[in-house]
Amino acid sequence: MNISKKALSLIRYNLQGSLKKNGINIWRYVFKGVEKGTGVERLFFIELIVLNPYLSPSDIVLGFDSRVSVSSEQLQNVLAGTVSAQKMMSETLVVPSYICVKAGILGAGARQLCFYAPVKDVKSSLKSFYFEVGRCSFSEERLSGLISQNPSDIQEHPGFLSDTGLISWDLRYEIRLDSTVGFSGKSANWFPVGINTVFAGNISIDGREYSVLPKNSFGYFDRIFGPSCPDNLFHLSSSHLTSVITGKLLEKSSFAVHGVYKDKVSIVAILEDKKIEFAADLSKRAYKSIYDCSTITDSVDGDKLHWTISASNKQYIVDIDVFCIASDLFVRTLELPNGKRKVIKFVSGKSSSGEIRMYKNNRSNLELIEHAHLADCLCEFGSLEVPEE
């Protein structure tokens, strides 16, 4: 894998110290597959999530579960008849602890399958990035796995937040463009380490088989880790860009937007030989960013969600517009390390259309560097959800 040493260290990074019992660690892969026989194209995702792994190393603990806390003294009072059992019973919210693999499909008919395990069931390496859990394995060059959930499994464990069915994959990947600029903070970190990643292999879901081809996989790989995640989620990323100016596919181009950090989003945009990085961990004066996600009504497609970003410093301006059909968006949930049933609830989908423009600020005028159409863009938007007491 021909990437920088810093990017490789970020890929290999695992939770250390107190984060083993109070932290989240995510490896996320996104790529396109083409259905065999029909040629239908779909956007897939695979995620490895490590959440408070050593808080409960031998058992899976879901934060959606609750446990009844009963002391021996309370139990004696119930037996003596001085306190009713109903009055004594009180719920104690638990803190989650598990390893989870999520894999699914985005866009129309979106769905995901999830597999959970305790950290004791994981095989891993300290010398390189390697995780093996259940029938899934992750390494620096390959992804393989199989997840199967039947209706009785989900009925017994609704907290799995998984659809029923079967998904399997066998993929190799290579990072073509890496980025070690993103956001680094005490509470959260994000890096688009494989901002342009090529995938090759096969993936199937419920009997439908898809080929993943290097020339049009348009892949993306990022890392999220730390004691927590931002309360508000705003994400866009794509490596499928076509120049409006020349009409050519921009093979050495990608972009990623992620936040919200300190009321800003971090932006990394690589358009052929131009690279712009706006990191939210820089000083407030380093750049300005305006972002929004709103609903609009289209006469053809109905309601759409519209992501907009405009960011600038003294040298460059980047404007991004992305649209998703609202009915194709998939509601997902990410548990947070601190428990108390706190989650990030967000919509996730594949873009229906989008554009990116990059300008150079020449003081007296703006020079258009590139204007490109976006496709196969991962789009996410959501916020912290806290249960009512």
Regions found by a protein language model. Give the residues of each.
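Structured soluble/peripheral alpha/beta segments that form catalytic or ligand/cofactor-binding pockets
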Residues: 1-389
